[in-house]
Amino acid sequence: MFGTMEIEEVAKALSSDTRLKIIRLLAEGEASAVSVFKKYNERFSDRRERATIYRELEVLYKSNFLVKTYREDSKEIVYRLAARSINIDLITQTVSAGP
């Protein structure tokens, strides 16, 4: 899942308050980009444009924090967390999925 992702990559992916809030939303369960966009703007005072939410979802996906799946029944792509937690090895400075 995370493979040999380095601490710098994780830090960069998690350095955005918007991305951290998206992770918080997806901790409640999988959701489409449109659903994340709507929930984000309902729940948080720092409203974001749809393009911003889509871009941040892709950053999290490319950083292996999210899994992206196409739902045949609803004809949409949904995102979910790839892992509930991560482990950081300070000696090798790598990151892996937690238990």
For the regions a protein language model found, what residue spans apply to each?
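DNA-recognition alpha helix
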Residues: 34-45
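Short amphipathic alpha-helical interaction segments
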Residues: 46-62
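Short acidic DE-rich linear segments
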Residues: 92-99
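Short alpha-helical segments that sit at the start of domains
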Residues: 1-24
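A short, conserved structural fragment
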Residues: 61-71
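Short, cationic-aromatic polyanion-contact patches
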Residues: 15-16, 71-92
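Short capping segments at the starts of secondary-structure elements
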Residues: 17, 25-35
